[in-house]
């Protein structure tokens, strides 16, 4: 990575401050770009879903891992919940999706409550384990909410044995009334569903899998209490990667926590953060972390910078921390501050091996929250920061009322925010398409066949706010 002559920055930069200069390229197609990472996380696209309660759940974990990313489960989850989620994700198919299911006796109201849990647009009606119908929003429109789904389900739908080539499923759906193929096991029971778009994605993305060929998932742990014991429990639960997480990672308790977990020799990549300086990066790697999480205050739900004045513009933080990590054989994840595909590309160009995304994914079908509608009937989901009063209240539920009240006074995050669900990109896979398409194009403009080459070859410039605004498309004439 280098800056254009005369563009060497005299101050720290955000993603908005920077642009990529196109260079000579021998990369013929975006599909020739390898987006897999080399940091040991096992991701085949450089996307990590942040350990936020409003974002990271089992539906998100399954879907993102199937497309090559990885989800970090929040540190507030009990070990039993982590174990159940890990077992669920690792039992999922690498190609077909887990469907929303209903029984024939369920009501239309039940169907409406569940249809938005997945992006498929349909629920499968199951009797004695076998699919007997499909229900969509259109079926439910104008129907009494107490009606039974057996009376409105569509019995004419496409089925195929699980293991059918995705291209064949795509062809089967070409003239189907509903864009959902119901995949069945050899005994005729329901195995999953696959849409036409899902069939296409199966040929583009490579799932992030463990040594046994199962989908990957990560889990977070804090720096308080018996960190080693919890890390051991998370590893035994089946987590593929551990994240030691706190807002201020460059502190003695973090270094002690890293050493405690590293000494267990669990055989898992160890991520720690957050920091924004070379010194902090070096200290965490020397303590035993293999990956350092970079970012203080850039996240959409974070108020740290406005509350404390502490933090650093994210692009410059990633550049400095990535350089320090490379000197020690480590890696960094850019955590927070990405709002467009260009930001992800710039974080990777700066030297990050993966980019953590939180709030951007909160407004999707796969995030854990319920889908809500505003007074204009526009869909949204609620998001909140992990240092907010809402998150702190959940984290301290077992404390005394006095301690809970005292801790509640010290929040650094938004407790409720509406994240709109984009009708054009309602599923997290739609956003992954959006992001990876942008990153692939960036690589072709730079002449990079993979992510290490992107960092090596990229030439950057510094732009004004007007320069950044110029790059925005105009929704109407001027």
From Swiss-Prot:
Key words of the record:
Allosteric enzyme, CBS domain, NADP, Oxidoreductase, Purine salvage, Repeat
Q: Which SMART domains match?
A: IMPDH
Please name the Pfam families in this protein's record: CBS, IMPDH
Which pathway is this protein engaged in?
Purine metabolism; IMP biosynthesis via salvage pathway
Classification via InterPro entries = Aldolase_TIM (IPR013785), CBS_dom (IPR000644), CBS_dom_sf (IPR046342), GMP_reductase (IPR050139), GUAB1 (IPR005991), IMP_DH (IPR005990), IMP_DH_GMPRt (IPR001093)
* Catalyzed reactions: IMP + NH4(+) + NADP(+) = GMP + NADPH + 2 H(+)
Which EC number(s) does UniProt give? 1.7.1.7
Cofactor binding mode, per the note? Activity is highest with Rb(+), followed by K(+), NH4(+) and Cs(+).
Q: What does this protein do?
A: Involved in the purine-salvage pathway. Catalyzes the NADPH-dependent conversion of GMP to IMP. Is not essential for viability, but may contribute to the regulation of the purine nucleotide pool by recycling GMP to IMP.
Name of the featured protein: GMP reductase
Traced from the root, the source organism's taxonomic lineage reads: Bacteria, Bacillati, Actinomycetota, Actinomycetes, Mycobacteriales
């Amino acid at each position: 990575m280098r800056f254009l002559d005369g563009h060497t920055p005299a101050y720290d930069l955000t993603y908005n401050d920077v642009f990529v200069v196109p260079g000579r390229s021998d990369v013929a197609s975006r599909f020739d770009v390898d987006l897999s990472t080399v940091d040991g996380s096992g991701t085949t696209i450089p996307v990590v879903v942040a350990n936020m309660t409003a974002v990271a759940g089992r539906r998100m974990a399954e879907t993102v891992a199937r497309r090559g990313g990885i989800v970090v489960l929040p540190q507030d989850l009990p070990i039993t919940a982590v174990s159940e989620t890990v077992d669920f994700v690792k039992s999922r198919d690498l190609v077909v999706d887990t469907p929303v299911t209903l029984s024939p006796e369920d009501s239309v109201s039940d169907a409406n409550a569940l249809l938005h849990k997945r992006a498929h647009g349909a629920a499968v009606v199951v009797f004695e384990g076998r699919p007997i119908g499909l229900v969509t929003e259109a079926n439910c429109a104008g129907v009494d909410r107490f009606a039974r789904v057996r009376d409105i389900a569509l019995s004419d739908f496409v089925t195929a044995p699980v293991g059918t080539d995705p291209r064949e499923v795509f062809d089967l759906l070409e003239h189907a009334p509903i864009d959902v193929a119901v995949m069945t096991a050899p005994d005729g029971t329901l195995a999953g569903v696959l849409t036409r778009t899902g069939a296409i994605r199966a040929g583009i993305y490579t799932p992030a899998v463990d040594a046994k060929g199962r989908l990957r998932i990560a889990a977070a742990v804090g720096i308080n209490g018996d960190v080693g014991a919890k890390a051991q429990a998370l590893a035994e639960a089946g987590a593929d990667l551990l994240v030691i997480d706190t807002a201020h990672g460059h502190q003695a308790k973090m270094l002690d926590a890293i050493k405690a977990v590293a000494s267990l020799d669990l055989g898992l990549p160890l991520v720690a953060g957050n920091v924004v300086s070379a010194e902090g990066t070096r200290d965490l790697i020397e303590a035993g972390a293999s990956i350092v999480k970079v970012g203080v205050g850039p996240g959409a739900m974070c108020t740290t910078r406005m509350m404390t004045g502490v933090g650093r513009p994210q692009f410059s933080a990633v550049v400095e921390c990535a350089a320090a990590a490379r000197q020690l054989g480590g890696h960094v994840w850019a955590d927070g501050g990405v709002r467009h595909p260009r930001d992800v590309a710039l974080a990777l160009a700066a030297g990050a091996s993966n980019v953590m995304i939180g709030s951007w994914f909160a407004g999707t079908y796969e995030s854990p929250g319920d889908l809500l509608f505003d007074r204009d009937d526009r869909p949204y989901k609620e998001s909140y920061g992990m240092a907010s009063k809402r998150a702190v209240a959940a984290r301290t539920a077992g404390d005394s009322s006095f301690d809970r009240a005292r801790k509640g006074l010290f929040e650094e995050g938004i407790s409720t925010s509406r994240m709109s669900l984009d009708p054009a990109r309602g599923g997290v896979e739609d956003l992954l398409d959006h992001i990876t398409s942008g990153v692939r194009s960036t690589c072709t403009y730079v002449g990079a066949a993979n992510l290490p080459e992107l960092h090596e070859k990229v030439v950057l410039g510094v732009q004004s706010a007007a320069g950044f605004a110029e790059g925005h498309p105009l929704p109407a004439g001027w």
